[in-house]
């Protein structure tokens, strides 16, 4: 393929950040600023994306671009319209994210928050270069806004106190990013953009800092991504599905971001799917009508014959109802074999969905993109994964998780991102005691899983503790001898710890007495009695008056190995009075056996 057939496409830019940090406002402001520069050509609206042509970038940045000291050959910037993690993860290509650059929006007053941390993890995993927009500078106490001006210009006009305040906030942010493994600095102090994350203070409300933000993004793309942005102009199109939608009069359509090559009406396309790829033919390609032509809301699209990367396009074709977001889409070229393209696409999907761990958790997500992100997050925590798939949680998933739980209860779990659970699955999960964890925030899914593991470990420990003879101390109540022998039945008060049927008893001098057969309260049998309770117990073996008397103190006869386990492994699960009773029992026992409980 000759270089003459290649062209440089626009870098694809995704905006990420914590909820309420101003992603949408900033993105709207960038678009609004571009629309306002209509002398230079304004903005080109795509499906799911907005293109800011280079001329418009130049108009907004003014002389700032000259500071880059590099010839700008990219034709513009393509911003993904939907901010957030989900759009970012759905726009995926083999080996990484589709976005060439991300803008991570952080509220300068709040700093790094949980979803910021998640965004940083995703960006690191996908190795996506990013710029930090330290947003909401207009909220810095005392800041005087200057609409749509470059940040540095506005900064110079602030009082020394306000400048100091902003510097402190930027340095706090630098420190937080450093804790997450990223070296960062204010953009005008960055010497090496390959090693240092640039922080651009911005305001999505006033537009301050947007010229520098666009300058830094343009410079990054031009200087470091030029090779990556070279595309084969006439090559078969490659795209990622952003969304699957049903449109009136069109049926099921897919909104896709084309990142390489060309797609034409009539082309055969292959779309990846967890079951098997969808092979279909493009019925029509649609782009949004310009705002000034959109008179009828139901007639929002115009048909085009072909679309070249990078672009957002709506594709209408048969058999798209099964398509899923995050799936790869490939055009079958004239000299390509359909089967070969199907195989390549399937391999790409299987990289995400097929797991090799025999025992592991089951992950379900709403799209291939989010599935890949969730799988990545759990792999980072070294959690084995048995199956990862797209779609709601079904009975089949529960049966599979139950089979895993039989061998390892901590892995017999289903994790769902943004999915539903069928009624059948819910009922079966209750019956089989299979945990289902659902959330629409990835980091919370991982946290919930870790909490569940802790609870299960705790439950397992309590279960093991309950299999031991636990420490108990009782007093035989005077006047409550109901039967003297075969079995002896007496009233007792539990002074410390716990007693249960089956527990052996001993006297204060360590002599064995016999086993508790039954415990009754108000004439009804009970499973255990704890400190403070007064109950009747039957004891097989001893005779009241010969082996023990009313008023005597008795203890549970805890075997040495049980005491050892309680001292070493389960001490934290014992109540204070149980621990006290255990110490007293050990003291009695060690008169005969100095190594008791050791």
Swiss-Prot record:
GTP binds at residues 17-24, 81-85, 135-138. Residues 8-226 form the tr-type G domain. It comes from the Archaea. The keyword GTP-binding applies. Residues 81-84 are annotated as: G3. Residues 203-205 are annotated as: G5. SUPFAM superfamilies: Initiation factor IF2/eIF5b, domain 3 (SSF52156), P-loop containing nucleoside triphosphate hydrolases (SSF52540), Translation proteins (SSF50447). Residues 135-138 are annotated as: G4. InterPro entries: EFTu-like_2, EFTU-type, P-loop_NTPase, Small_GTP-bd, T_Tr_GTP-bd_dom, TF_aIF-2_arc, TIF_IF2, TIF_IF2_dom3. One of its GO terms (molecular function) is GTPase activity. The keyword Secreted does not apply. GO terms for cellular component: cytoplasm. Residues 42-46 are annotated as: G2. It holds the Pfam family IF-2. Residues 17-24 are annotated as: G1. Keywords: GTP-binding, Initiation factor, Nucleotide-binding, Protein biosynthesis. Function in general translation initiation by promoting the binding of the formylmethionine-tRNA to ribosomes. Seems to function along with eIF-2. Belongs to the TRAFAC class translation factor GTPase superfamily. Classic translation factor GTPase family. IF-2 subfamily. This is Probable translation initiation factor IF-2. It comes from Methanopyrus kandleri (strain AV19 / DSM 6324 / JCM 9639 / NBRC 100938). The lineage of its organism: Archaea, Methanobacteriati, Methanobacteriota, Methanomada group, Methanopyri.
């Amino acid at each position: 393929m000759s270089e003459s057939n290649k062209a440089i496409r626009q870098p694809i830019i995704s905006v990420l950040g914590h909820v309420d940090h101003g992603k949408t406002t900033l993105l709207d402001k960038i678009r609004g600023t571009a629309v306002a520069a209509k002398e230079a050509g304004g903005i080109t609206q795509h499906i799911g994306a907005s293109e800011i042509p280079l001329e418009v970038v130049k108009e907004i940045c003014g002389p700032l671009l000259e500071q880059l000291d590099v010839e700008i050959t990219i034709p513009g910037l393509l911003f993904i319209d939907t901010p957030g993690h989900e759009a970012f993860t759905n726009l995926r290509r083999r080996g990484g994210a589709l976005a060439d650059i991300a803008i991570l929006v952080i509220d300068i007053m709040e700093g790094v928050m949980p979803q910021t941390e998640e965004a940083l993890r995703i960006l690191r995993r996908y190795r996506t270069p990013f710029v930090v927009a330290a947003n909401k500078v207009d909220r810095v106490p005392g800041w005087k806004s200057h609409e749509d001006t470059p940040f540095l210009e506005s900064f110079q006009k602030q009082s020394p106190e306000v400048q100091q305040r902003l510097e402190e906030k930027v340095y706090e942010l630098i420190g937080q990013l450093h804790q997450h493994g990223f070296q960062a600095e204010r953009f005008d102090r960055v010497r090496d953009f390959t090693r240092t994350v640039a922080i651009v203070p911005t305001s999505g409300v006033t537009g301050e800092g947007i010229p520098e933000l666009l300058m830094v993004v343009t410079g990054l793309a031009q200087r470091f991504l030029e090779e990556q942005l070279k595309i084969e102009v006439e090559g078969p199109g490659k795209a990622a599905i952003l969304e699957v939608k049903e449109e009136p009069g069109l049926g099921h359509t897919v909104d896709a971001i084309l990142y390489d090559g060309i797609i034409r009406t009539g082309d055969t396309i292959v779309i990846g799917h967890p079951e098997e790829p969808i092979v279909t033919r493009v019925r029509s390609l649609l782009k949004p009508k310009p705002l000034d032509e959109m008179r009828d809301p139901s007639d929002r699209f115009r048909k085009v014959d072909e679309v070249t990367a990078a672009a957002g396009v709506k594709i209408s074709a048969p058999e798209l109802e099964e398509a899923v977001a995050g799936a790869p889409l490939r055009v079958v070229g004239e000299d390509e074999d359909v089967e070969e393209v199907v195989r390549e696409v399937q391999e790409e999907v299987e990289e995400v969905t097929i797991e090799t761990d025999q025992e592991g958790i089951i992950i379900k997500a709403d799209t291939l993109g989010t599935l890949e992100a969730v799988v990545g997050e759990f792999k980072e925590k070294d959690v084995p994964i048995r199956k990862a798939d797209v779609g709601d949680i079904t009975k089949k998933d529960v049966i599979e998780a139950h089979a895993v739980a039989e061998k390892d209860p901590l892995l017999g779990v289903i994790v769902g991102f943004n999915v539903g659970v069928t009624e059948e699955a819910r009922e079966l999960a209750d019956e089989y005691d299979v945990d289902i964890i659902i959330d629409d925030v990835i980091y919370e899914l991982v946290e919930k899983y870790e909490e569940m593991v802790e609870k299960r470990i705790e439950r397992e420990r309590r279960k093991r503790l309950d299999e031991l003879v636990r420490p108990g101390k009782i007093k035989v109540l005077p006047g409550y001898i109901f039967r003297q022998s075969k079995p002896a039945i007496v009233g007792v008060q539990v002074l410390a710890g716990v007693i249960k049927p089956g527990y052996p008893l001993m006297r204060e001098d360590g002599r064995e007495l016999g086993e508790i057969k039954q415990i009754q309260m108000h004439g009804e049998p009970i499973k255990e009695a704890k400190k403070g309770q007064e109950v009747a117990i039957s004891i097989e073996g001893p005779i009241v008056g010969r082996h023990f008397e009313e008023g005597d103190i008795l203890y549970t006869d805890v075997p040495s190995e049980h005491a050892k386990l309680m001292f070493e492994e389960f001490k934290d699960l014992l109540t204070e009075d149980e621990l006290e009773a255990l110490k007293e029992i050990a003291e009695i026992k060690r008169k005969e056996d100095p190594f008791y409980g050791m």
